[in-house]
Design a protein with these regions (language model features):
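Helix-breaking motifs and short loop linkers at transmembrane-helix boundaries and internal kinks
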Residues: 44, 76, 97-103, 131, ...
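C-terminal membrane-cytosol helix-exit motif in multi-pass small-molecule transporters
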Residues: 175-194, 383-391
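C-terminal transmembrane helical hairpin of 12-TM major facilitator-type secondary transporters
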Residues: 274-327
Length: 399
């Protein structure tokens, strides 16, 4: 029986569930950053140890993205998503009992593996349910749940951490995904089945690098690596960097909230522009605008400019990144998109491991918040050059 587009109610239910999964992922990813001003002194972590703990979560994301993208193309989207949500919920909950850098790093590594496995699967589901002329908007709408979840984590931190301690945010972030599992089991339809056993499926090397895709794949990995280096540096360290400017923990949580709200708006706006204008102009323009935002953030010392510039940084950074999630898979055949997205995200996660480690090292060397922000400007501009070449040279592979 031929595949047909899912009818509107089924697609809406699937997209809503994917949005909720992305929201819970965003909450979990941001939780460690907004909890850091309390967690680091409570566990007696040095800046270097904190960077290693943050990096462990990113390492889990790398492994999860590679495994999740490969498995999603073979075992089906729904079983993989349920497994991933269960893993990141369970080990986020386990973070509550962490007593030092080793146990904390282990739990963040395993939670990151679950988070990483979910991400390429969400992209594949969004591409399946979206009309061809709304693919980028559908993908960015779904992924706007991640910064929305990050904003909720920042609000949670501002309202509850001082009263209930750093454990409370991981308790909430672990229980909620586990509660979502029975809802997914009942309401989420099975996605596109894996190819029949007799169908010829290309090997990983052929799928990623064959038929003239070598340049696109390398550029995609490079762009994702540098962009996610900056993203996860900010997600993990922005609250602490702002607090170090003399604006306190509340100022740090406010900056994280502004960053995530700007990210949600950027996902919607830049995703819409990509569908209307094509990917080149919106994505190419976003990177220099992001560099200017970080340059301004480095010099800002009062709360209002910090909030505005953090919001602008989120707008351009996440707007460009999540639009690329919707654009890059289209450069590959449909049967290989889960693998392609997973490989690109995994390459990005290698960069994301470096972001927290670099920030911890620079702070330990006395660079201060302004120096860390300024160090990210050339990284952003390099990613922008790679994204420009990729969107100019890339071609739609068809379904």
């Amino acid at each position: 029986m031929g595949a047909s587009p899912p009818h509107a109610p089924r697609g809406a239910v699937t997209l809503s569930l994917c949005f909720l999964i992305a929201l819970l992922e965003g909450f979990d990813i941001q939780a460690i950053g907004v909890a850091a001003p309390l967690l680091i002194p409570a566990l007696g972590l040095t800046p270097g140890q904190a960077g290693v703990v943050f990096g462990a979560g990113m390492a889990g994301l790398v492994c999860g993205a590679l495994a999740g993208g490969w498995l999603a193309d073979r075992m089906g989207r729904k079983p993989l998503l349920m497994m991933a949500v269960g893993v990141f919920g369970l080990f986020t909950l386990a973070t509550v009992v962490a007593g030092g850098p080793v146990s904390l790093g282990l739990y963040r590594l395993l939670a990151g593996a679950g988070l990483g496995a979910a991400m390429p699967t969400l992209v594949a589901v969004a591409l399946e349910i979206a009309p061809p002329d709304r693919r980028t908007r559908t993908t960015t709408l779904m992924f706007s749940g991640m910064p929305a979840g990050g904003a909720l984590a920042a609000l949670f931190a501002a309202g509850f951490l001082a009263r209930f301690g750093w454990h409370s945010i991981f308790l909430a972030g672990g229980v909620l995904p586990l509660l979502l599992l029975p809802v997914m089991a009942r309401l989420m339809p099975d996605s596109r089945a894996p190819a029949a056993g007799g169908a010829q499926r290309p090997g990983a090397v052929e799928a990623l690098f064959g038929q003239g895709r070598l340049l696109i794949t390398v550029l995609a990995w490079f762009t994702f690596g540098l962009t996610l280096l900056v993203l996860y540096l900010l997600l993990n360290w922005l609250p602490s960097l702002v607090a170090a400017k003399g604006l306190g923990g509340v100022g740090g949580a406010g900056a994280a909230f502004a960053f995530n709200v700007g990210s949600v708006i950027g996902c919607w706006v830049i995703g819409m522009l990509v569908d209307r204008l094509g990917p080149r102009l919106p994505i190419i323009a976003a990177y220099p605008a992001l560099a200017l935002s970080l340059f301004g953030l480095a010099g800002a010392d009062s709360l209002l400019p910090v909030l505005v510039l953090a919001g602008l940084a989120g707008f351009f950074l996440l707007g460009a990144q999540y639009s690329l999630y919707g654009v890059i898979p289209l450069y590959y055949p449909a049967r290989s998109r889960g693998l392609a997205v997973g490989a690109s995200i995994a390459a990005g996660r290698l960069g994301s491991i470096g972001g927290p480690l670099i920030a911890g090292h620079l702070l330990g060397q006395g660079w201060g918040p302004a120096g860390v922000a300024m160090a990210m400007v050339p990284v952003v501009l390099s990613a922008g050059v790679a994204a420009a070449v990729m969107t100019i040279r890339g071609h739609h592979a068809g379904d």
